[in-house]
Amino acid sequence: RLPGSLVQPNDKNTAIKAALEAGAQGLIFPMIESREQLDQAISWATYPGHDDGRRDGEPLRENRGVGFCRANAFGRDFDAYMRDTAPRIFLVAQIEHIRAVEDLDAILSQPRLDAIMVGPYDLSGSMGLTGQFDHPDFKAVMARIHEACRRHHARMGLHVVQPDPGELRRQVAAGCRFIAYGIDSVFLWQAAARPAGV
């Protein structure tokens, strides 16, 4: 079961802090292209001592401010939140650029990372193949991502933009463990395009 998660700007400490203080139990960092970007985003989402993604010899770099807020019932549940909830915030890196694929082994080796999610339109666009999901080069990149996730025992998610049950089954069979299926606007225009049946 995926906790309630918010997509957060990965370069905005204040937005990440605000989402967590409001009670979000998961964050999706968009457009992560490198391990360094991911480390920075995770540092803003974790309290000192809660990030086990440090490389040997690195100092503590967690930057989440500590205070009473909605997430810890304005202090009433502070100790329980710090002990039980904060260390388990579900953290997802969106893979939306070919540069991220080039650094994927480093990204997937971040111990605090819980999953990645592929944004196929942006990823294909970064390859000069916007929306060409059947192109051999795009398929090869997707296979490379799946293989890297298997190698690192990492959870992989995907946005299946067009609601296609066959594609959904294929992606689950390929190993995707969570899928954003469709977009509200796509569901609406597809439903509106069907005959009324009256």
Predicted regions and their residues:
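Expand to "…catalyze enediolate/carbanion chemistry for C-C bond making/breaking, isomerization
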Residues: 1-198
